[in-house]
């Protein structure tokens, strides 16, 4: 063993590098650990196990420095030594080499691997070597991360294959390489462990991009700044700065890709995908009530306002992601809010909450990153991989992540697969050391002493065994869509008591405090690995193993406009699952967990002269291997097909990849090397050796046992005697056999026995001995002393920590500056790309030649359209468009397009229509305001005048408003008194003047107020004021009042102030004036007749009585007694004569005719106003003003009269009689969408419990799509079926039918279930129709909306009654109703429609049907609906009274006219066909065709069909059946759920208001509405429309009324307000008489909320009239005014669905003859049977699902070979004698069914061939009796006539013919 000594000399124990060379007593883990410690402390961290294995201990410093600073004993030195020996064996023995790395995370495997790779590539330093090295760097960049134990933790298994040509030389030529990645740790992408990093590339791109690049990628924006923003997918911000040069790493990454021949544009695309992944992590989601109306909306009454959806908060980040993915931001948001799963073989769309949307976004991020890694690796392989036929030998470097006790990311699957790989790699090691060549040794008769060791075969078999290993079982359970508990049970059955390495916990456990077993939420299984026992949680493991990529994401990507994204999702790494019936439809997918290629040793062709087993190149490229059979196949289940790769889960794929690795490792002609990497301590402390830590690892890997084995046998080469002697160059003169010659050579060499053994035909020899005998030892000796200047790598001295900067050690760095062969960018690296060019690429903007983000977003929103229809606008539409443009011409298109963000022309047109409608509405409101407010003011302007009585009255009514008159002007002295304290009088004394004329208290100085004719008046002139007290009322104070002296400042007083009165009046007028004294014209005329000089001038009253009588002159200025008359006549005589003439009532014309100078006229006018003014003419009682006054009153009375009529209409009294039992057949339809189980059960149970004959009511539930609503744990279909008791095993075939959708969405598929539902003693037949969608539908399959759910039944009944071809689904519905339930569909006369969240009263159906029977002209009716959740919130409280009044006033009033304009779909019943004639009514052709309108592309049609489909259906009934009535039945009652949030309530009322407007517009032109003039329904409709659009003005008008009443106290406004109050009083009378006392409180709340109902809601509704989801269909204008409908949904061919009954019956017949007849899909029984018997309670033969039939007049031929089935099936009637006595069954659209004698059922089928059916016979009998003479007709005569008409013998049908004839003649039919 001396040859194993180190070159370091003989200094001590540490000088021994070989552990097996140590003495036997040191061959224990403790002693070996001590020996490693002694070497570690002298900088020798390595030790040899044999020539093909060594141990390396991570020093956490330099990996290239050994003892004395040289390579000897260092990790790099040992790695290069192993690489040299592998290369020699590769060249000289043409063997495949495999190097396997074992070690825990942080032990330095990645570094040692890089050293070995560098050393191997140094052997052939070529441009290809550079690319191979670059490929390794790129792989590490994408798959390594920083963990708590190491900065370069590999998180993907690596199988790196170097491909050589060794056929022609012993110096192998590198011709290619192949990267095989195994199972990337995808959970880390979105769940970064605390204190660790994500994959390095994500940090690189964030740090290494330039400013321009950051802006493009969305990193440099203020809200996305890298400095202050925390990136969800990058962990804690401290991880951005952990000593790793991320910026340099990114530049190296880009350079590596360029040198690997990736185009610059593709590198930029890769960076965009990486950026989008980071941005996906930033998306924040919230729940939002989506109030935007879509055509596929469905659900109950509470869903009308909108449904809860999940939306992105940060729309800017969403836009960035969408732009980089090349999709629409809206579609991306929708896709993230939904997720399609496969549950029980059905595709179901789950409506996600914010947490679910976040998980969905994480799935998208993981998918993108996984596909990107696969794409880059596959493209690298395409660049560097050699053709398989050229490959002779390979060197495989195998490095899987180390064993781990727990998952840092929380992923049980990643932990399981990672540890399974570690277990497999360790098992390979054990087999190589202990079991390999065992057979050959035995054949060669060589005995080797056995060595005991820990064998992990149990764990390996338990985990990896094909078929029934743990991973295979997990994969099988995933493919079977089993639950976690079912997986646990399968593991228990497989391993319990059978495999000691795997233990399974109990599936059930007792919870604390409970004695009952419940599901064990902590269930797990335990695996005893070679490195320890690990417990794996079972929770979520099956789903995680599926790694299902939702079909929604794939559907989204299918629409991408990015070629790179399309290539990314188009690669083979994405395994898709297609629909079995439509292979082009991808339902889901998964990213491969195994490499896309296989090892070359497994896949290449056999070369001449070699014995290597290979596969075809085609298999290599695809990388697909035949999958393993599942456990079911071992059980003999031959019905299950062999699993396909696309259906494999992660565990199955990973198992296959491990199998490939294992097989390639064990392949013939493969030599294995092993590198054991150990950690010196657990704390990553440099140069510290923890003996316990190392000893544990030694024990884990069984180093001591391996060393013992090597001491016994260290063989790696087997040489036949001849080859051995050839290498030994034995002297030919030596005599003896080959064996003897070999023995002689061995004796001469003196090799240890553990390194050489002689067999019977050859020699087992160690690699060291082989190299010696082959004289190759010199090629690997002395290499450690090479100085750096002679070819050493200057970067090789970098410590392990250097990998923080470059991920891999310097020796493997593609950026080495070596000038010798060890460098890849040295002188020998010539690949045509200079570093300068690469640097320029990295330093600039890589996106400058690509589209901007805005351009990407715009391209992502584009749609590929196809024309599906061509049409022309109607004349009315053209007129409306013209009006719209006339009203909105001033708004330019570019503003709507850019500012309004409406790129589509039809959306812009709808906005214009909305604006035009709003203009019309606002104009109507303004017109109403003008008529009711402005018009009266214009006709009779407001006068601020007061009569004397009013002045006095105000004083009496309101003390605070104390008014007084001064010279014809009225002032508020009540405000003056407190504001101006009087020092000489008390305030109470002043109040005596309130309501009086106090002009006498204020004497005036005449000369100060009038200039006369000369320009001045003598100051001594006095003129008394003529008061207006003509009624002798004590409200006038004269100048004799004592207080007048305080205001007398005339000329003759001691205190003269001529201007005091003028100044005082100016102040008074500005502050306290309220108006003027008013004199009606008749009063003025009366005063003039009393010899008063009084007249009207310009609407003002002037009095010259005192002036004409003569004034006075103050005595102080006139000395004589005579008065100078000239001083007193200061007024112009012509003016005075005006007041003396005969026509003195109005002298304005005479005044205008006076010839006065302007100065004199102005002077006279001033005198008139100041001295003679009495007041204004009071015109308030004139004819014009009375008209204006009573006009308002008349309008108010008209409006109130309508409400009063509604009140009287609501007064419907009578006894609460219970209707008798009725025998009419009714259907009860319930459309279901995403309601919860409580709502659905309430609706279904209430319908089933209705007090109506159970046999005569059919419960129909239509499920709109396969959707799981938020808060539900099952799809709606499953909830409904569970309520009805249908087993999960029932799975009918989906059948096609026509739906209401765009393009190809018109083709839908559905399933039909039927059976009996038993609840509280009721046994009710039911029919469930679920719309599952075509196979190509991924998101919300089958969902088309509530209107489509109604159309499913309406169209079916329409085709039944009109004898039209049916779709396959409708044929199946017919079969289920007729043959399984046992009722002919034509018998159903009425349909009750209720919503899924509505509960109906028990007597509802009876009351409805009674109304229909009482009035045969009644086509539809509705009942009263109350709120079930009245007290949920204030929003629901304010709706209670409104609901009550809207039914009991509005609908009751409309019911008087027989024209209820809105029959709510939540609770209404319709007449299907006329009672007398059988004519279809509710399902008539006109109604169905109009209601099934698909092209809903205008604002009007969207408001009709998307907002108020129920109201529009009522409109159609009134329009096409105008002779029939619609009524309100107030005694029929139901309860529903009302919106309890403001947003949903607002949206719901928007829908109601807008649909009301548009439906009333449809009704107004109808001329058939009842009665005439103002008593007509048309007038009421017009008033309703008008009141709807002017509601905002109405509330404003009421406010105006209140204000006017408070301020003016006029009689008329008070009366109008009293009338309004009386109206609400009438409403109160209604609920008082009905003892609804609680309505008092609800009414008060409603009145408080009136501004909301009448003002806020209408304004919001009118402006949001175009708030729709416009879908993908639009209208484009073509040539000559033609318009075309285009859509991206494809073109639908209606002929592809309908099918003739003959075809369907023929198919069913063929199917029946080929297999056994099955029972009902739901229960297996026919109706009214409670046991699986073939005879019903009526004695008829049992019906079978395949015995389909229709009436003869429904398309079935009169003569058919399948008539027997028609006869037998027709006997399966729901009622026999009861139906015969029901009456009114005969109809040209359907006949009855009759009992047949027992012998009829026993006749041979051959005798019945070609006979007519019962229905055909019945129809002909009815026709014969209609025209025959009933006095002479006989049964025999009827039979003979039938035989003549049908042309067949009917003896066998005599009994039926006789019974039918009797029934018709007796009136039973």
Swiss-Prot record:
Q: Which residues form the Myosin motor domain?
A: 1-778
Q: Which Pfam families match?
A: Chitin_synth_2 (PF03142), DEK_C (PF08766), Myosin_head (PF00063)
**Which top-level enzyme class is recorded in the Swiss-Prot or TrEMBL entry?**
transferase
Q: Which cysteines are joined by disulfide bonds?
A: none
Tell me which UniProt keywords the record has, alphabetically: Actin-binding, ATP-binding, Cell membrane, Glycoprotein, Glycosyltransferase, Membrane, Motor protein, Myosin, Nucleotide-binding, Transferase, Transmembrane, Transmembrane helix
Q: Where in the cell is it found?
A: Cell membrane; Cell septum; Cell tip
The record's section on PROSITE patterns has:
DEK_C, MYOSIN_MOTOR, SIGMA54_INTERACT_1
For the region Actin-binding, what residue ranges are annotated? 658-682
What ranges does the record give for the region Disordered, renumbered to this chain? 579-653
Residues engaged in binding ATP: 103-110
Topology relative to the lipid bilayer, per the entry, is: Multi-pass membrane protein
Molecular function via GO:
actin binding; ATP binding; chitin synthase activity; cytoskeletal motor activity
Q: What is recorded about the domains?
A: The N-terminal myosin motor-like domain (MMD) does not seem to have motor activity but is indispensable for polarized cell wall synthesis via binding to actin that ensures the proper localization to the hyphal tips and septation sites near actin structures.
Function, in words: Polymerizes chitin, a structural polymer of the cell wall and septum, by transferring the sugar moiety of UDP-GlcNAc to the non-reducing end of the growing chitin polymer. Involved in mycelial growth.
- What protein is this chain from? Chitin synthase csm1
Query: What is the originating organism of this protein?
Result: Pyricularia grisea (Crabgrass-specific blast fungus)
Give the gene name.
csm1
């Amino acid at each position: 063993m001396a040859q194993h000594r180190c070159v370091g000399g003989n200094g001590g124990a540490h000088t021994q590098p070989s552990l097996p060379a140590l003495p036997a007593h040191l061959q224990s883990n403790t002693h070996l650990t001590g020996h490693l410690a002694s070497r570690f402390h002298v900088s020798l961290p390595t030790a040899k196990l044999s020539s093909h294995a060594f141990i390396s201990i991570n020093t956490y410093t330099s990996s290239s420095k050994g003892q004395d600073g040289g390579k000897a004993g260092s990790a790099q030195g040992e790695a290069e030594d192993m690489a040299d020996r592998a290369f020699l064996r590769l060249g000289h023995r043409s063997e495949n080499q495999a190097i396997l790395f074992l070690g825990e995370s942080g032990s330095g495997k990645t570094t040692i691997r890089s050293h070995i790779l560098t050393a191997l590539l140094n052997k052939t330093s070529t441009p290809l070597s550079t690319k191979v090295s670059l490929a390794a760097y790129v792989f590490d960049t994408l798959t390594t991360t920083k963990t708590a134990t190491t900065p370069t933790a590999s998180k993907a298994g690596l199988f790196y294959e170097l491909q050589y040509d060794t056929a022609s030389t012993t110096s192998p030529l590198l011709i290619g390489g192949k990267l095989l990645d195994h199972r990337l740790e995808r959970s880390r992408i979105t769940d970064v462990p605390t204190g660790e990093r994500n994959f390095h590339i994500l940090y690189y791109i964030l740090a290494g991009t330039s400013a321009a690049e950051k802006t493009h990628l969305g990193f440099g924006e203020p809200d996305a700044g890298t400095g202050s923003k925390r990136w969800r997918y990058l962990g804690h911000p401290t991880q951005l700065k952990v000593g790793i040069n991320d910026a340099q790493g990114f530049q190296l990454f880009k350079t590596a890709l360029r040198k690997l021949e990736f185009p610059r544009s593709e590198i930029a695309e890769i960076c965009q995908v990486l950026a989008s992944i980071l941005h996906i992590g930033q998306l924040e989601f919230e729940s939002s009530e989506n109030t935007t109306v879509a055509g596929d909306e469905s659900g109950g009454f509470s869903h009308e306002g909108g449904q809860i959806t999940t939306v992105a908060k940060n729309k800017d980040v969403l836009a960035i992601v969408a732009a980089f993915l090349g999709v629409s931001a809206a579609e991306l948001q929708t896709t993230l809010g939904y997720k399609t799963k496969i549950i029980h073989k059905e595709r179901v769309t789950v409506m996600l909450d914010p947490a679910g949307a976040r998980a969905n976004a994480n799935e998208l991020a993981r998918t993108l990153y996984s596909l990107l890694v696969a794409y880059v690796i596959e493209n690298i392989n395409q660049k560097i991989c050699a053709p398989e036929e050229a490959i002779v030998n390979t060197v495989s470097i195998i490095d899987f992540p180390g064993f781990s006790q727990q998952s840092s990311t929380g992923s049980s699957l990643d932990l399981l697969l990672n540890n399974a790989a570690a277990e497999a790699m360790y098992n390979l090691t054990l087999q190589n050391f202990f079991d390999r060549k065992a057979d050959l040794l035995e054949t060669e008769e060589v005995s080797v002493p056995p060595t005991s060791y820990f064998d992990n075969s149990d764990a390996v078999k338990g985990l990896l065994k094909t078929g029934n290993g743990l991973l295979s079982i997990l994969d099988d359970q995933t493919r079977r869509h089993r639950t976690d508990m079912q997986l646990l049970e399968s593991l228990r059955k497989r391993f319990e008591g059978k495999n000691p390495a795997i233990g399974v916990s109990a599936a059930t456990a007792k919870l604390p405090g409970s004695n009952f077993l419940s599901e064990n939420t902590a269930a797990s299984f335990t695996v005893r690995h070679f490195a320890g026992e690990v417990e794996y949680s079972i929770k979520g493991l099956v789903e995680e193993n599926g790694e299902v990529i939702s079909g929604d994401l794939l559907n989204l990507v299918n629409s991408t406009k990015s070629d790179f994204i399309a290539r990314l999702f188009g690669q083979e790494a994405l395994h898709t699952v297609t629909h079995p019936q439509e292979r082009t439809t991808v339902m889901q997918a998964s990213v491969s967990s195994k490499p896309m290629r296989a090892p070359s040793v497994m896949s290449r062709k056999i070369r001449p002269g070699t014995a290597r087993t290979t596969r075809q190149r085609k298999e290599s490229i695809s990388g697909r291997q035949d999958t393993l059979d599942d456990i079911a196949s071992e059980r003999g289940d031959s019905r299950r097909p062999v699993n396909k790769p696309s259906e494999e889960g992660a565990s199955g794929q990973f198992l296959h990849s491990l199998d490939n690795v294992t097989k390639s490792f064990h392949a013939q002609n493969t030599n294995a090397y092993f590198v054991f990497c150990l950690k010196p301590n657990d704390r990553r402390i440099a140069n510290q050796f923890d003996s316990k830590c190392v000893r544990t690892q030694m024990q884990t890997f069984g180093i001591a046992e391996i060393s013992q084995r090597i001491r016994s046998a260290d063989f790696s080469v087997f040489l036949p005697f001849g080859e051995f002697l050839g290498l030994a160059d034995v002297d030919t003169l030596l005599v003896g056999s080959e064996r003897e010659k070999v023995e002689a050579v061995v004796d001469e060499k003196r090799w240890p026995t553990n390194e050489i053994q002689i067999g019977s035909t050859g020699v087992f020899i160690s690699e060291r001995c082989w190299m010696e005998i082959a004289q190759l030892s010199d090629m690997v000796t002395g290499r450690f002393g090479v100085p750096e200047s002679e070819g050493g790598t200057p970067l090789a001295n970098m410590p392990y920590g250097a990998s923080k900067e470059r991920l891999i050690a310097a020796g493997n760095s593609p950026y080495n500056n070596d000038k010798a062969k060890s460098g890849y960018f040295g002188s020998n690296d010539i690949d045509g790309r200079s570093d300068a060019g690469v640097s320029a690429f990295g330093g600039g903007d890589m996106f400058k030649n690509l589209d901007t983000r805005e351009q990407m977003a715009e391209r992502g929103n584009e749609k590929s359209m196809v024309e599906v229809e061509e049409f022309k606008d109607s004349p009315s539409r053209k007129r409306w468009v013209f009006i719209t443009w006339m009203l909105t011409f001033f708004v330019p298109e570019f503003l709507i397009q850019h500012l309004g963000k409406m790129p589509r022309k039809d959306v812009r047109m709808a906005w214009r229509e909305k604006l035009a409608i709003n203009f019309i509405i606002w104009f109507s409101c303004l017109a109403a305001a003008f008529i009711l407010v402005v018009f009266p003011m214009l006709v009779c302007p407001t006068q601020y005048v007061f009569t004397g009585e009013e002045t006095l009255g105000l004083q009496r009514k309101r003390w605070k408003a104390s008014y007084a008159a001064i010279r014809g002007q009225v002032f508020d002295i009540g405000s003056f008194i407190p504001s101006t304290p009087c020092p000489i009088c008390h305030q109470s004394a002043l109040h005596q003047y309130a309501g009086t004329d106090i002009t006498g208290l204020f004497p005036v100085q005449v000369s100060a107020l009038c200039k006369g004719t000369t320009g001045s008046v003598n100051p001594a002139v006095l003129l008394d004021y003529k008061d207006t007290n003509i009624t002798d009322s004590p409200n006038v104070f004269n100048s004799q009042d004592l207080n007048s002296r305080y205001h007398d400042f005339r000329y003759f007083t001691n205190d003269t102030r001529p201007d005091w009165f003028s100044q005082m009046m100016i102040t008074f007028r500005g502050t306290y004036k309220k108006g003027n004294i008013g004199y009606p014209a008749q009063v003025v005329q009366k005063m003039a007749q009393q010899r008063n000089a009084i007249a009207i001038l310009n609407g003002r009253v002037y009095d010259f009585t005192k002036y004409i009588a003569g004034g006075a002159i103050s005595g102080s200025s006139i000395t004589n007694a005579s008065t100078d008359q000239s001083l007193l006549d200061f007024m112009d005589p012509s003016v005075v004569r005006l007041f003396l003439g005969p026509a003195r009532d109005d002298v304005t014309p005479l005044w205008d005719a006076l010839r006065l100078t302007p100065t004199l006229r102005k002077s006279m006018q001033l005198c008139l106003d100041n001295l003679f003014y009495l007041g204004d003419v009071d015109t308030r009682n004139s004819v014009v003003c009375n008209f204006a006054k009573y006009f308002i009153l008349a309008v108010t009375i008209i409006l109130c009269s309508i409400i009063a009529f509604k009140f009287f209409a609501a007064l419907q009294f009578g006894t609460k009689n219970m209707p008798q039992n009725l025998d009419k057949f009714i259907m009860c339809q319930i459309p279901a969408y995403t309601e919860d189980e409580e709502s659905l059960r309430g609706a279904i149970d209430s319908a089933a419990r209705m007090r109506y004959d159970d046999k005569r009511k059919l419960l129909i539930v239509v499920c709109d799509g396969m959707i799981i609503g938020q808060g539900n744990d099952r799809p709606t279909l499953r909830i409904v079926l569970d309520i009805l008791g249908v087993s999960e095993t029932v799975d009918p075939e989906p059948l096609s039918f026509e739906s209401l959708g765009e393009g190809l969405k018109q083709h839908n598929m559905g399933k039909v279930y039927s059976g009996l539902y038993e609840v509280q003693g009721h046994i009710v037949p039911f029919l469930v129709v679920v719309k599952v969608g075509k196979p190509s539908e991924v998101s919300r399959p089958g969902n088309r909306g509530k209107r489509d759910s109604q159309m499913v039944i309406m169209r079916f009944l329409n085709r039944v009654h009109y004898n039209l071809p049916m779709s396959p689904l409708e044929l199946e519905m017919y079969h289920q109703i007729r043959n399984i339930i046992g009722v002919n569909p034509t018998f159903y006369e009425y349909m009750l429609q209720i919503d899924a969240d509505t509960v109906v009263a028990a007597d509802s159906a009876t009351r409805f049907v009674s109304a229909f029977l009482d009035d045969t002209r009644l086509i539809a009716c509705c009942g009263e609906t109350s709120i079930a959740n009245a007290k949920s919130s204030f929003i629901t409280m304010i709706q209670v009274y409104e609901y009550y009044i809207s039914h009991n006033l509005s609908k009751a009033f409309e019911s008087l006219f027989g024209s209820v304009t809105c029959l709510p779909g939540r609770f209404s019943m319709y007449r299907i066909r006329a009672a007398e004639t059988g004519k279809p009514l509710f399902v008539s052709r006109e109604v169905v065709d109009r209601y099934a309108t698909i092209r809903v592309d205008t604002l009007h049609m969207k408001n009709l069909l998307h907002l108020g489909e129920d109201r529009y259906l009522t409109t159609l009934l009134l329009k096409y059946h105008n002779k029939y009535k619609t009524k309100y039945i107030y005694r029929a009652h139901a309860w529903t759920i009302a919106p309890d949030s403001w947003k949903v309530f607002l949206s719901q009322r928007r829908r109601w208001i807008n649909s009301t407007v548009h439906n009333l517009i449809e009704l107004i032109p109808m001329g058939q509405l009842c009665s005439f003039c103002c008593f007509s329904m048309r007038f009421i409709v017009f008033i309703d429309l008008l009141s709807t659009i002017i509601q905002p003005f109405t509330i404003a008008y009421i406010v105006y009324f209140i204000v006017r009443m408070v301020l003016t106290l006029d009689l008329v406004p008070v009366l109008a307000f009293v009338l309004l109050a009386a109206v609400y009083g009438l409403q109160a009378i209604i609920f008082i008489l009905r003892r609804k006392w609680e309505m008092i409180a609800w009414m008060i709340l409603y009145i408080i909320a009136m501004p909301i109902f009448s003002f806020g809601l209408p304004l919001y509704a009118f402006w949001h009239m175009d708030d729709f989801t416009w879908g993908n269909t639009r209208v484009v204008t073509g040539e000559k005014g033609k318009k075309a409908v285009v859509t991206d949904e494809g073109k639908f061919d209606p002929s592809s669905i309908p099918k003739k009954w003959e075809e369907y019956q023929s198919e069913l017949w063929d199917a029946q003859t080929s297999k056994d007849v099955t029972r009902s899909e739901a229960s297996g029984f026919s109706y009214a049977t409670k046991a699986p018997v073939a005879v019903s309670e009526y004695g008829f033969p049992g019906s079978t699902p395949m015995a389909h039939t229709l009436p003869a007049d429904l398309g079935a031929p009169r003569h058919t070979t399948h008539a027997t089935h028609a006869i037998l099936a027709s006997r399966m009637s729901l009622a026999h004698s009861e139906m015969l006595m029901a009456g009114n069954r005969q109809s040209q659209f359907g006949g009855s069914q009759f009992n047949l004698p027992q012998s009829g059922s026993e006749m041979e089928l051959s005798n019945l061939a070609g006979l007519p059916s019962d229905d055909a016979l019945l129809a002909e009998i009815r026709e014969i009796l209609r025209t025959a003479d009933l006095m002479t007709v006989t049964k025999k005569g009827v039979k003979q006539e039938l035989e003549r008409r049908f042309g067949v013998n009917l003896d066998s049908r005599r009994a039926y013919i006789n019974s039918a004839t009797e029934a018709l003649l007796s009136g039973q039919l």
